[in-house]
Amino acid sequence: ILAFGSLNLNAKWGPIAALIGLGGLIYMLDGWLVSVTKESNAGLYNLQMDKTFRWGMFWFLFSELFLFGLLIGSIIFVRFSITPWIAGQSGDASQLTHYLLWPDFVKHWPLFTPPSAAPASSSFSMESIRRIPLINLIILLCSALLLTDSRYHLKHKRYKLCRLTLNTAILLGGTFLAIQSYYFFHLMKANIIVKSGIYGSFLIAFLGLHLLNIIAALLFLFILCFRIYQNKLFAKNPFSFDAAVWWWDFLVVIWAFGFFWIF
């Protein structure tokens, strides 16, 4: 439902379907995390279960790496191979292709105006297109540093500093989510995603997938914060905190690569 609604945001029912799907996803994640937390508090997990969780998190991030790597690799191919080819900058054959098929196309990036397409009517300036992702990158980097620092304080049983740095990291993560949502929906409103061909298709896939991961990771951090305030998360059993740090750092690295190669 979430994917179907996201692909039809321009329709009247599209945002409603996307919100229903997002609500269902959050409900399922919350139910699973709460169940795991209750089982952990009841002492039902042993070293073998801890090892299983760690391997599960590893394979989850490994699969995410290939998914995001495929998306970023495809746009790198478009940027450095396809775009120069249709602009006639890749040898004699590409010059002939450019002359016969797309004589008016000029190489540019980001590829907001693909060959044989009308220019997208955009209220976004090129400066805004790059500035907002840069601001988000800085916010994510700061939140990742604070989250790592919070993990360090938890390990050394400095729970007050752990709560402070974790709360700040969550606040920065929420700020990223708000700015990114604004950015995503204004790209839609400005027709950049709808009328930019392959670049627009890539943006909706990459930004949407990354945004979903941020929402899920923030939910994870909220539950960790709640457990710390209840004095139920201690230095002796930090896997849940380790998993949150790994996931958040992974999303920061993905956004850094996306910023430098996409925008």
Question: Where are the regions that the model predicts?
Answer:
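...captures the hydrophobic TM-helix bundle architecture rather than a specific catalytic motif
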Residues: 1-263
